[in-house]
Amino acid sequence: MNSYKEEILQTKSDFTLKNLIFFAISTLCYKRALFNENCYKKVNFEIEHFKGADFDCQLKPTVVSLQAGVDKEADSFLEMMKTYIFSLVSMKVPFTVYLIISSQCKSILEDDAVEKEIFSFTINPGSEEKICCESFVSYQRSERFVIKLFLSGNVKTECKDEEKVVQIITKMERFQLSKGEATKAGVFLNTVETKDCMSWLNRGEFKDIVSFYESNNGIAISHCSHAFVPISTEKIMINKESSLFDSQEKIDSQLEKFLQPLKYDEIGSTQILDEQSVEKSLSQGKCEKMQNESRGLREIKNNNPCEEVKKSNWLKKNISGSDKVDKAEKKKALLNCECGDSTEDSEMFQCERCDGWVHCACYGFESDSDPRQPNQLLCYTCLLVDSESSLYDRMTMLVAYRRAIRCIWASEYQGFQKLAARLNCSYADAKRIEERLVNENIIYKEKKRKWIYFTNKSPEMVSYLREKYFTPSRWISHLNFQNYRQENQRVNMRSFLRPERMEVIERPKKVSKTSNTKETDTMKPLRI
């Protein structure tokens, strides 16, 4: 009976210590707006259990706890904190947690010029159950930050005491409550068993702290003795991290089939074509198939050397001749949208890396004032061509399909011949786009006029296109790119996707013709 009571008391003590650590770190993250504001939940907890400037009783700070299922970065940070911190609590050993917030990731603690803020949480299960939070370095708010969580504890073994250190790094864009912006990022995990890493703890010198950097062999750690320990990237990534993005990696079978690289088959034409144009398109399709069978929907503009030579010669000629180049001509020369359409729109974005202009609709944005646009937009060529070549081919096809929807929404569909000329693709590819538009009921024909296509601009079609095609980060969000933010709530904004307004024409009512012989004040006799 006595042993049963002791187990209950120990479990209650562990639960209290876990709550103390969890609420302390969550409150610090909340006060510095490190995650989405919807991730935090207010809890009724006594502030007397905490010590430190951030937990002053006179200021009456709000104690919160991190909630899962809202922000991916918060979920990853929460899982790692529960896995490693709570395991040390259950081991009944004294340890210290160091929470480091910095503006850079590479050598953030060796450089004094780097803005950073370090918090230490001392936990001793045998002493009074209080969390002492100390801040070491002043920190100025920055747009980017890095969270580093160090855990140190003495674990007693049969042979000797070993000191284990767990380093958790969460790298992301700063979440600003005023603008409501957030960006996805990666989460790295590192586990090291050494005493050299913790030599700075006793002296309190930050220049000897462990530094974190990326190398060709993976992730490496720099010790105070200037020795490097390379660690493979496969061990660093968490197994549970894949489950966080499973829902984003699932693509419906119909769209996945369309996004695969197309094969150039014969044209099942339903419209009148000249014999020369048909032979030319078929021969062009066969040549392209022999050259590169895994290419995307169209010939990529950047892979055409003749076009690049003309473009470079044109720029050199104009820049050498006159220092002031016309903005319109320069913009047209730098138009580098993957859709293949060289036509300028009133709503376009410029890539931050290559200065090329792309259409807003081709990237899933409904206008240049779309609140889902990132602060620094990169085109798919700069973003995917080197790292994700297969995804780049599929996104190129999706861009062409978005461009086709944008064109037929502005003006009626005029056949796949003109669509092929506009998208700079073959007739076979344009015919495939037309068939998909018809299958999805985006364009349709009437019985009386079967040779004319009409655009379906119903409210149901608008919601369908927004959900399936005009969601900017839908197909690349699982890759965790930093320049695409999370989806914001849709607000009233300018958009080309507007349902068609049905004009109601009031027709005059028919008046029954009656002959009246008597003349009254309200009714006059009809003139025959």
Swiss-Prot record:
Function statement: Facilitates initiation of meiotic recombination and DNA double-strand break (DSB) formation at DSB hotspot sites by enhancing the interaction between rec10 and rec15.
GO cellular component: linear element
Gene this chain is encoded by: hop1
Localization (cell): Nucleus; Chromosome
Gene3D superfamilies referenced in this protein's UniProt entry, alphabetically: HORMA domain, Zinc/RING finger domain, C3HC4 (zinc finger)
GO biological process assignments: meiotic DNA double-strand break formation involved in reciprocal meiotic recombination; reciprocal meiotic recombination
Keywords for this protein: Chromosome, DNA-binding, Meiosis, Metal-binding, Nucleus, Zinc, Zinc-finger
Subunit structure: Interacts (via N-terminus) with rec10; the interaction is direct. Interacts (via C-terminus) with rec15 (via C-terminus); the interaction is direct.
Annotated source species: Schizosaccharomyces pombe (strain 972 / ATCC 24843) (Fission yeast)
Zinc finger (PHD-type): 334-385
Biased composition range(s): Basic and acidic residues: 516-528
Stretches for region Disordered: 507-528
Protein name: Linear element-associated protein hop1
